[in-house]
Amino acid sequence: MIANETIAAIATPPGIGGVCIIRISGAQAHAIAVNITHKKNLVPRQAILSHFYDLSGEQIDQGIVLYFPAPHSFTGEDVVELQGHGGIAVAHALLSATLDFGARLAHAGEFTQRAFLNDKLDLAQAEAVADLIHARSQDALRAANRSLQGVFSQKIDALADELLRLRVYVEASLDFSEDEIDFLGEGKIREKLVDSLQKTQQLLAQSQQGQLLNDGIHLVLAGKPNAGKSSLLNALLGEERAIVTPQAGTTRDIVREDWIIDGIPVHLSDTAGLRESQDLVEQEGIRRSFDAVKRADIVLLLADGSARDNDARAEFVSLQEELHQLAPHAQFLVVYNKADLVDEQTAGDGLWISAKTGAGIEILLKKIATLAGKNQHEETVFIARKRHIHALESVEAHLQRALQQLEQFFVAELVAEELRLAHLALGTITGTVSSDDLLDEIFSGFCIGK
């Protein structure tokens, strides 16, 4: 990114629509807008009706021009928005005119990156812009808004300030060590360390909830043929998404659907029935099913509840053990289907449902939400990403080591160093500590017009 260049991009989705918006940012934004509108003076923050012209003077469209002079704009630079009639030809003609008059095409996320570099928002807030756009549920939308408003950043900054003050206090013990002032021994440092560690762990738990709303979970329906996996998929989605027949082995390939449960995005996979097969196509489907289980966060292991013979039960137990070994990280929930065909339901730790009648489905949904970790109060959750989680886990580890150094070895230098490293890890979240590579990676995932 070259900061002194003026950039432009289409800020609205491609295709036919009511309005198209061209966004321009940089020192030449006002001059470019004057050339396109043929108006000598653009009143700041006022919508002005204008014709739009290309480099040859031919009229392109009629619409609205808005001018936001620096520093009171989204990017902190001079910003202009040209709002024309929606349509592919109009949008591209307006964009071409901005480029002809001196702008260059913006890179993905470059408007938001300039806002970050001009201190209009920190890195966590910048990421929240993209998360807001990609939110797939109302819970995710509200959480992204909290991050954009600075709720997450304020918590990070407050914790960073505490760690900095604590580090100064510890380092003071080094400066006054010869004066027989026992800073470490008086207990205040340990008390503050424990408090900071607890706040970090609370923040980590809230961030994990935010990541859950952002990334969702991978949920796999697995089991023997004819257990009712495809019927359950259809029951959960409320539509006939998968083919259901009495014939075992109907599902040959994985059927994937994105779904929302209690505000959590769920990547749902219905898999082929797991059994020995001589059919080459079915064998490939079974192999893919095992791969899906390996990647799952939650596995719903379905059993045919109407199959009461000992052989069927033994096969199910064997499959259960095999899948647990295959995916030790995943959470498993045993689900007994076809409750409508059974008079007596005894299932130990499993749930009874009927995909056909819908019995037990509501209980199953609540159980899935619980397994996914939906347990935070809505007003405390903000959107978070994997890198935020990793940074907070690093902070937690450094504070735990600092506490260990304090309690076991009483070495102030090592305590101060762990506090310094914890403080640096926090800085990577809001961007007070960042590299060009990290910034490029983050902003390259944005839309061109953002």
Curated annotation (Swiss-Prot):
Binding site for Mg(2+): 230, 251
GO MF annotation terms: GTP binding; GTPase activity; metal ion binding
Keyword terms: Cytoplasm, GTP-binding, Hydrolase, Magnesium, Metal-binding, Nucleotide-binding, Potassium, tRNA processing
Cofactor binding, per record: Binds 1 potassium ion per subunit.
PANTHER family: TRNA MODIFICATION GTPASE GTPBP3, TRNA MODIFICATION GTPASE GTPBP3, MITOCHONDRIAL
Subunit text: Homodimer. Heterotetramer of two MnmE and two MnmG subunits.
Name of the featured protein: tRNA modification GTPase MnmE
